[in-house]
Amino acid sequence: MLYCGSTGGHYMIMTTNNNSNNNNNNNNNNNNNNNNNNNNNINQNHQHQHQHHHHQQQQQQQQQQQQQQQQQQQQQQQQQQQQQQQNYGESTTSTSMIPPSITTSLTPLTPTLSSQPQNIQQQQQQQHHHQQQHHHHHQQTQQQQQQILSPMMGSKRKLEEDMGVGQPTSNLTNEYLMSNNNSLKPILVSSPLLTPLSASPGLTSMQMAFANASLSAPSTPLSMSPSLGPCSAPMSPSKKSKNSRSSSKSKYQNSEERWQSTTSKDNGKPSSPGIVKGPWKDEEDAKLVELVNKCGPKEWSSIAAKIPGRIGKQCRERWFNHLSPEVRKTNWTPEEDKIIIDAHASLGNKWTAISKMLDGRPANAIKNHWNSTLLKKIGGDSKSLNKEKDDDDDDDEDAEDGSSPVLSPISLYQSSSSTTTTTTTTTTNSSEKSNIPPFALSGSTTTSTNNLNNSTNSTNSINNNNNNNNNNNNSSNTNTAITTNEPLVAPKIIRAQTTPNSSPSLSSKKTHDKQKVPQSPKNSKQQQTQQQTQQQTQQQLQQQQQQQQQQQQQQQQQQQQQHIQQQQMPVISQQPHIQQLPIDQQIQNAQFQQFHLQQPSMPSSTSVNIIPNQSSMEQHHYQQQQQAQQQQHQQQQHQQQQQHQQQQQQQQYLMQQHQQYQQQYQLMQQHYQQQLSQQHHQQQHHPQQAQQHHPQQVQHHQQHINTTHNQHQQQQQQQQQQQQQQTNNSQVNSNNTDTTFSNSHPIEPHEVPYYYDYWGSSTSGSQTLIPSDNTTNTYTIENNNDFLLFDDNQHRIQPLQQHQHIKQEHAQMSHLPYHPTQPNNLNTTTTTTNNNNNNNNNNNNNNNNNNIPTPNMSASTTGTINHHIHQTHHHLTTPLSQSTPSVSTDQNNYINYDISSLFSLPNEI
């Protein structure tokens, strides 16, 4: 099988055989030619280096880095050769197509096989000779550098070791090419008009594409040659690639390889051969958006410097055509199609001017939409229309393919002859002599191997004669290999696309097309028909717009007339709609109307006047009702205020009475304390007389207190009855009055003290000293004859532990001998006077038991009162020697204040 690879203006067919000696000779010959050409270019660059001596230190550092890189490359090449040797078989033949190795940016590459003209090489030789005389030292250093930087040094040494021959390898290539054998025909034709490969912006990207291509056959030593690999033709920087994300798969398997190919090894900046023409990746888009947000959509050169492999023009077009937020990505509407068709009829292919008519649609998108869909709708000839002037040649990035221009797919066919033939368009005498089939290059002629060999150096011509013998000896082996195999299949190469720089005719044609008039006379008929159809569509659109304007004007006029009529109409018709009366008012109005209808009819003259005044009468009636309601509301408020004032007066009166009662009570207390003090004084001197007169005084005092209490209770009942009558009257008069004030200000309860609240009432089982609702508790006397005691912190004291001590204190207080008794012994001897007094007090309390709170008294006063009450009550009941007081065990009836003063009476006295 044979494979063909081609890029730009170069075409190459590579054939291999099992004989590895011929392949190695070709590689070595090509290496020598490239080294000679590279030496010439190095000498030219050496003049600039001699002027800048201060850059030598930097170059040394760079050389060290490059040495390391080349060592890595040599190791990789050795590994590839080992794999190739393992894959080779003795009886099989295979071909492969691998791009040349990547060279450094310091030494620009030259066309293969010395394709430059002889004049150029002679000038280079003269310059080289002149530089050898003046700058011999610098040439030696530079030659050493070139030996280090040469990408094929490792492979050359490897081939010499494999061959085991000490003869120069540069003589092998010409012998192989000059052989008259028709069996093997390596074909390589290069145009003399091509620029050096270093000027080609798509070189490295294509090389990496071929390097990453997966082929079935293993690589051969031909792949080591920097000149026999497929290389791309130079492209103009103005030609843009396809930026659409929906393109085919990327030709780079690894992103690092892509960036290494696009950046130079010296400064890390994008070089001219490192411009990427492939589709944009997501990483590049994200980086571009970030840089535009920082720098703004202006400084495209600085933005492109931060994106390897991209120039400012590519960044600008990528932003404005795809990434800008102003770009619309929605489907095209029929309105937009009409605008484009109409604008194209008048302006032609001026896409930038047309894009100004559509918001969010860039010129490139409009152009693509025109070429893809609108031309089919119109039915015009796309070829004739595309011949017109296109003012937006720079915006055709989406119309082109994402990769560099390559040939169309190769079609293979079988031939009956043993030799290979190709279809050609032009032939020359030189190609017939060398038995090399010519290839059709656009605007260029083919050159033979004789012309190429004449332009080489004198040293190469001598070596070529020596290599002819080797090629003749090896021709027999190749003939046998080809005859044994089946008829070979030759590639049929069809040129699909050419680059602008590969042929001068394209560039001249392009400049000529730019100078053309947009509308040529050849296409005038077709354009006239298109213009007529477009004019008709424009007229229809204009008519529709006029009709719409007329309809809008009519609607505006109608609205104005309606507005004027509404202003002229009386207010009567609008009032029921503007403000509706409440339902009660509407019912009253209906009743009022029925009442007037029942009345006898008036003359026609009067009836005419009544109708327009009917609404005014309703309003007047409604106003009267509102006024009446307001008056009622004011009266109710006035009554409420009066009631509130009366309540306040009553409260003040009650407070005054309460204060008077407290004053009287305090006076009585003082008087009673004085009497008690006198009695104590008398008891010390005359204890027997005090015991006789004391019960009578207590009875007289209790009667006086009961009478005052009954009077006060009667007054309070009368006041409560008066308040109830007033509240009943107010509820009858005002059923719908506001009760918020009375609820928010309730009458506070008054604390009215009563005599029995302090002295208590005796029952059959207990005797209350200070009964109350929540604040005070009861003190009872039970049959167990035990006191319930509390300390200063109101903690209960165990009475059984201090029973003997208490009795001893009572005996000391009464100056009587102490007779200890058992706590369970019950004393049944009681006086009849105490029972009678208790019964009387109980009757009074039961009759007057109304939940009236007690007056607020301090703990000291209550303690002293209870002490005296207990003392007097104790003297009235039984003798101290025979009975002991008892206290109930009910915790709810305990006294919540300190009664320790009961037992400290002798000390105070």
Curated annotation (Swiss-Prot):
Domain HTH myb-type: residue ranges: 272-327, 328-378
GO cellular component: nucleus
Lineage: superkingdom: Eukaryota
One Pfam family, short name: Myb_DNA-binding
Polar residues bias locations: 216-226, 497-508
Regions of compositional bias (Basic and acidic residues) in chain numbering: 379-389
PROSITE patterns hit by this protein: HTH_MYB (PS51294)
Assigned keywords, A-Z: DNA-binding, Nucleus, Repeat, Transcription, Transcription regulation
Location, primary (coarse class): nucleus
InterPro entries assigned: Homeodomain-like_sf, Myb_dom, Myb_TF_plants, SANT/Myb
Compositionally biased tracts (Acidic residues): 390-401
Amino acid composition bias (Basic residues), ranges on this chain: 47-56, 127-139
Cellular localization per UniProt: Nucleus
GO process annotations (BP): mitotic cell cycle; positive regulation of transcription by RNA polymerase II
Low complexity compositional bias, start-end: 17-46, 84-126, 415-431, 444-482, 622-642, 672-726, 733-744, 826-851
Listed GO MF terms: DNA-binding transcription factor activity, RNA polymerase II-specific; RNA polymerase II cis-regulatory region sequence-specific DNA binding
Start-end of DNA-binding region: 300-323, 351-374
UniProt-annotated stretches for the region Disordered: 15-65, 84-149, 216-280, 379-482, 497-531, 616-642, 672-748, 826-855
UniProt name for this protein: Myb-like protein Q
Species this chain originates from: Dictyostelium discoideum (Social amoeba)
